[in-house]
């Protein structure tokens, strides 16, 4: 099965990092614009929902237009079981309005693995406590069974006898496709021209 179009768009942004200090990251400002919030001019404003909305827009779908992660609890249709690409909405602290949103790429009993924006100030895959999950959502069209596999931990073992990590496999495939490989050289800044 193919990955959903919004996931292809999100993987293409993998590694974008927020500018530290003065100045703003053009890619992050573009996420605000594409999500319908061209009024935001600084990347210091929380941008996980902007990233989610921008990736949906790139796939020809409307997001919520809000910068509130929890706004996605009312978007699309609810999912009972997680699918790769599902919009996962999480709680954040004790504030009933605060949250985080990203795209589900894997899960196990304890953790959800999300591809999302503003995760350690970057577009990355990060693990979150599964107890924080408030809801999983899916666009009204296409149906999840048409494009996405259930998100679960892999049971296959790697050459070291440990369980294979499906999130690592996805990330590695992306790096190999986009960058042509990787290096252990600490002076190599990465990128396709190196």
PLM region descriptions:
Residues 1-38, 100, 118-121, 132-194:
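Cell-wall polysaccharide-cleaving catalytic domain and substrate-binding groove, primarily
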């Amino acid at each position: 099965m193919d990955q959903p179009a919004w996931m292809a768009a999100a993987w293409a942004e993998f590694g974008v990092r927020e500018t530290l200090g003065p100045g703003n990251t053009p890619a992050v400002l573009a996420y605000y614009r594409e999500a319908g919030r061209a009024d935001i001019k600084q990347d210091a404003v929380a941008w996980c929902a902007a990233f989610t909305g921008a990736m949906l827009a790139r796939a020809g779908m409307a997001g919520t237009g809000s910068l509130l992660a929890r706004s996605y609890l009312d978007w699309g249709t609810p999912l009972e079981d997680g699918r790769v690409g599902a919009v996962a909405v999480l709680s954040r602290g004790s504030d009933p309005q605060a949250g985080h949103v990203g795209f589900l790429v894997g899960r196990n009993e304890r953790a959800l693995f999300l591809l999302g924006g503003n995760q350690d100030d970057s577009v990355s895959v990060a693990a979150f406590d599964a107890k924080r999950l408030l809801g999983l959502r899916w666009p009204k069209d296409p149906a999840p069974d048409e494009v996405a596999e259930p998100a679960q931990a892999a049971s296959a073992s790697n050459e070291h006898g440990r369980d294979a990590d499906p999130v690592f496999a996805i990330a590695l495939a992306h790096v190999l496709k986009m960058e042509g490989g990787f290096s252990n050289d600490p002076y190599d800044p990465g990128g396709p021209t190196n």
